Amino acid sequence: MESQQLMACAILVIVLVGIFGNSLSFILFSRPHMRSSSVNVLLCALSFFDFSLLTLSIPIFVIPNLDLWANDLSLSTYMAYILKLIYPINLMMQTCSVYIMVMITLERWVAVCRPLQVRVWCTPRKSRNAILVIIVSAFLYNFVRFFEYRFVVTESGALYEKWLRDPGKHRWYYVGYYTILYIVTHFLVPFSVMAFANGHVIVAMCKLSKTRQMLTRQQQREQSTTVMLLIVTFVFAICNTLPFLLNVSESIFPTLFQDESTRGLAYWLNDLSNLLVVLNSGTTFIIYFTFSEKYRQTLVFILKNGCCATVSDYNNYTAMSRTASMRISSETGGQIQRQGSKMSNSSRSSDVLLKPIYMQKRSERFSSEYNERTCKHLAPFEEHKLPKLPSEKRKKKLHKMSAVEHRGMPEITITFSEDLPDGEPDSPCQPC
């Protein structure tokens, strides 16, 4: 009994931490600027389902194993209501969590392996529609769970007994639904899809890692998001393998929890599987915080400004953060830029010399080198040129002087009005 209480206390600690983390993740992913991405819509839904799963784990897995009961009858009465009403809802949340993980894996596969179709296939509206389909399907699939137990006073004093869950009375339900259909819907289909998609994503990311320097900032951000979600998927697969194996073992050996030889080991494995399920749902926010820069930035913004801040406040906050980071980088790089500007004038002339003559523009060539090349062709014509007359030289000199005077002093033109009275002097200035 002490080991069960220790396990219950460990589960309670993980549940409380997970409730805080998933509630924080739900607030972050439900912000307006975060809902613009399809994967953030799915992560918001996953945070909600994990939060619900952890909350329901307290009355199902923690409270029955604590030393809180005066007698067995009170515990039996409590378990009757839990198994009849609360446990089926917990299974619905678990089904939703499994298929939300499948949708996240498929979204990453499209983003990495089919980038041209990502804007058509992966939109926030389609993600919301997929979440709605998952919720309805999980409710319909697990609705029959409400009839696995029924309220009845047994010979031992318990207020419930197995009904559809009893393999002796309802063998078809136990083999068909509880065993085969559960294996197909909760293990074979989701884990096969996730293994196939994640394999393709890992191969594609290995190819992209070779050309990492050629990636844009947006592509690098998508790659870090993919790494984060791959880790979430792997943790999900590891933590849900033992519950699946235990469920299959119970279907093969119906007396696994009743036989005295296997009862202790079966209950210990059952508590361990519950701990792994809770651990998976309670630690996802740690992975988000570790690998997502936007998650950390939004978390700091909410802690500083509260949950009621607007989108414009967030945009101003991110703009100020980018400006501060650019200012820091500019201070370190300013000296390098100034040194480079000093060397640019000298390097520009050396660059001209490195070019072949036929690739140089005439404006880039040195005047001496240009004159040397042209004088070779003009030398024969200079010998036959007639000398200029002195009058031509004098005219050219006077023309240059008049041009200089024309540029230096503006010309003033005075026009006289034609309506001046007769007899007055033709003067441009009249007394007032």
Swiss-Prot record:
All ranges on the Extracellular side of the membrane: 1-8, 64-84, 150-176, 247-271
Ranges of the Cytoplasmic topological domain: 30-42, 106-128, 198-225, 293-432
S-adenosyl-L-methionine listed as a keyword: no
Gene disruption phenotype: Decreased locomotion velocity. Restores normal quiescence during molting between larval and adult stages, in neuropeptide receptor npr-1 mutant background.
Transmembrane portions of the chain: 9-29, 43-63, 85-105, 129-149, 177-197, 226-246, 272-292
Intracellular or extracellular location(s): Cell membrane
Pfam hit, one: 7tm_1
Superkingdom, taxonomy of origin: Eukaryota
Tissue specificity note: Expressed in a subset of neurons in the head, midbody, and tail, including AIY, ASI, BAG, URA, CAN, I6, PVQ, DVA, RIM, and VC, and in the anal sphincter and intestinal muscles. Expression from the ASI neurons is involved in promoting arousal.
Gene Ontology molecular function: G protein-coupled receptor activity
Keyword Protein transport: no
Membrane topology term: Multi-pass membrane protein
GO biological process: G protein-coupled receptor signaling pathway; positive regulation of protein secretion; signal transduction; sleep
Keyword annotations: Cell membrane, G-protein coupled receptor, Membrane, Receptor, Transducer, Transmembrane, Transmembrane helix
Location of region: Disordered: 328-349, 388-411
A GO cellular-component term linked to this record: plasma membrane
PROSITE patterns: G_PROTEIN_RECEP_F1_1 (PS00237), G_PROTEIN_RECEP_F1_2 (PS50262)
Function according to Swiss-Prot or TrEMBL: G-protein coupled receptor for flp-2 neuropeptides. May act through the G(q) alpha type of G proteins. Involved in mediating arousal from the sleep-like state called lethargus, which occurs during molting between larval and adult stages, in part by regulating touch sensitivity, and working in concert with neuropeptide pdf-1.
Family statement: Belongs to the G-protein coupled receptor 1 family.
Protein name, as recorded: FMRFamide peptide receptor frpr-18
